[in-house]
Swiss-Prot record:
GO terms for cellular component: cytoplasm. Keywords: Cytoplasm, Magnesium, Metal-binding, Pantothenate biosynthesis, Transferase. Pfam families: Pantoate_transf. Catalyzes the reversible reaction in which hydroxymethyl group from 5,10-methylenetetrahydrofolate is transferred onto alpha-ketoisovalerate to form ketopantoate. It comes from the Bacteria. This is 3-methyl-2-oxobutanoate hydroxymethyltransferase. 3-methyl-2-oxobutanoate binds at D43, S44, D82, K112. PANTHER family: 3-METHYL-2-OXOBUTANOATE HYDROXYMETHYLTRANSFERASE (PTHR20881:SF0). It comes from Listeria monocytogenes serotype 4a (strain HCC23). Its main location: cytoplasm. It is found in: Cytoplasm. GO terms for molecular function: 3-methyl-2-oxobutanoate hydroxymethyltransferase activity; magnesium ion binding.
Length: 277
């Protein structure tokens, strides 16, 4: 299993880092078999798996439950778990307690926090306490309720400079990596070159030190709306839906199960059960 020191070396050597967001045992198993470097258990599971319209309703118990499943499916892969909405916006002590609960109960190797500002101090204190932290800048889904959209961030010079300053701040606080989401690729390149820690991009161009996409987006599974930055490497929905429809049709027509799908008893045992005629 790769560790933070390995990710630093990969950045130094120009080797791209691969991260995939997964939420359960079978998807994590697939990801580990594909030899991805990291798994993110994102609070996006609220929308992708649980059917919410945002990440806000996701709880720590949700994150722990899904991370435990991911760990069982990918025991040899570095796992990062999102701290959900409002679990790191209280006191430092509350933040440390919540991070400890997630790491101890789920087995995650690191936690991810969105934003900067007051979050920078939380990253520093978590790092001091021995909890590895991945930062997240740019589009931060937990803040969409305030910003009102999922649009590209940091397009103006002022916003770009603010993001650069925040990236340097979370690095100084001890973050082991930064997710850069939905920012101009030129800015992502500058940030990546300015930092000694790895940058993991999603909608941030190819110049970041690594990339992350959601498992479901990669395989084309259950996605009703596809973001511009997503590339689907398969279209699983195109095979799933007809397969399920065929099953329903065959059961209704009593053509499934066939004899080959059924178990039988020896004729002699049947006679013993029902009596001999």
């Amino acid at each position: 299993m790769k560790k933070p020191v390995d990710f630093f070396a990969m950045k130094e050597n120009g080797e791209k880092i691969t991260m995939i967001t997964a939420y359960d045992y079978p998807s994590a198993k697939n990801v580990e078999q594909a030899e991805a470097d990291m798994i993110l258990v994102g609070d996006s599971l609220g929308m992708v798996v649980l059917g919410y319209d945002s990440t806000v309703p996701v709880t720590m118990d949700d994150m722990i439950h899904h991370t435990k499943a991911v760990k069982r499916g990918a025991p040899d892969t570095f796992v990062v778990t999102d701290m959900p909405f409002m679990t790191y916006h209280g006191s430092v002590d509350e933040t440390i307690q919540n991070a400890r609960k997630i790491i101890q109960e789920s087995g995650a190797h690191a936690v991810k926090l969105e934003g900067a500002g007051e979050v920078v101090n939380k990253i520093a204190r978590l790092t001091e306490a021995g909890a590895p932290v991945v930062a997240h800048l740019g589009l931060t889904p937990q803040s969409v309720g305030l910003t009102g959209s999922y649009k590209v961030r940091a397009k103006s010079a002022q916003e770009a400079q603010e993001l650069m300053d925040n990236a340097l701040a979370v690095e100084a606080a001890g973050a082991i990596a930064i997710v850069l989401e939905a920012i101009p690729r030129q800015l992502a390149e500058k940030v990546s070159k300015a930092l000694s820690i790895p940058t993991i991009g999603i909608g941030a161009g190819v110049e970041t030190d690594g990339q992350v996409l959601v498992y479901h987006d990669i395989i084309g599974y259950g996605i009703s709306r596809r973001a511009k930055f997503v590339k689907a490497y398969a279209e699983i929905d195109e095979t799933i839906e007809p397969a399920l429809a065929s099953y329903v049709k065959e059961v209704k027509a009593a053509t499934f199960p066939e004899v080959k799908h059924s178990f039988t008893m020896a004729e002699e045992d049947l006679k013993g059960l029902y009596g001999r005629e």
